[in-house]
Amino acid sequence: MKDLLKSVLRIMGLLAVSMVCLTGYLAIQNKLTARDILSFMQERYVQDEAGYVEELRKGMLARQACIRINYRGTLQEDMEKKALDMLEMVFETNEPDIPDDADYLEYTYQGVSAELISFFGIYQVTYHFDYLETQEETEYTGRQVEAILSELDIKDTDDYTKVKKIHDYIVKELDYDEGLSRATPYEALTTGKATCQGYATLFYRMAEEAGVPCRIIGGTADGQPHAWNIVKLDGLWYNIDCTWDDPVGKGVDKYKIRHEFFLKSDNRSFLMHIRDGKYQTSEFQKKYPMAKKDYVRN
């Protein structure tokens, strides 16, 4: 142990510490004790990206505020970029029996920063997350969604019927939160109010629970930040905007259910909806081919 401690003392100057803010980058140098370095070198490490993503995903699903990943990589790796890339891979991991992963996870966390320690291809990344929902709130949402779907009685229906009933339920039961403070399915279900993010994330959760492939799309609509959904029917993907189908303002019938933005292509009705860049890539478009025409039920 003494020999190892002496070796650690000799290499202390080679250990770099930095802070990665995921909206930017800030590098700082820190002094670490020999005990810090010794502990760092004796940690258990994941050996590949799949293990990294699984560790990060497991912690996020448990709504852990602090998640530490120990990763054995190479000297040439850009770990600041990888820390971001691994987070994106978590959001792209969608297991059918876990309806609160993937997009639900992405749209119910608020922000993240990360600390990075590196030493000759060995890395320790510590993420610090702020979530919009607690684990208890997410679990409550899951129970409520199951109860609502049971009431809608759509288990043995076709996907079109499932999508329409979920859309109509959300439009009927929710009011738009003009105070822009309620962005989660939990807040939507407990207060009856939500922003577009709350509408889209609740629709996503219900569609996933019902077995209908669905994504949340972030971007702008009429020049303002916005979120909506796409769903897969008969092999193609269609837009759904529950928020814009929910009438607001004076003199409107709040109980009237519209379908002006229901199962639409990117043409006509959705020309004012502009996706964020990551939803416009050729890779995304190939994976989620959009219909050229609005959906018409046979």
Describe the residue ranges of each PLM region:
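Secondary-structure boundary elements
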Residues: 134-188
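N-terminal accessory/pre-domain segments preceding catalytic cores
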Residues: 4-157, 268-298
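Periplasmic OmpA-like peptidoglycan-binding domain that tethers envelope proteins to the cell wall
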Residues: 188-197
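Hydrophobic/aromatic-rich core segments of domains that either
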Residues: 198-268
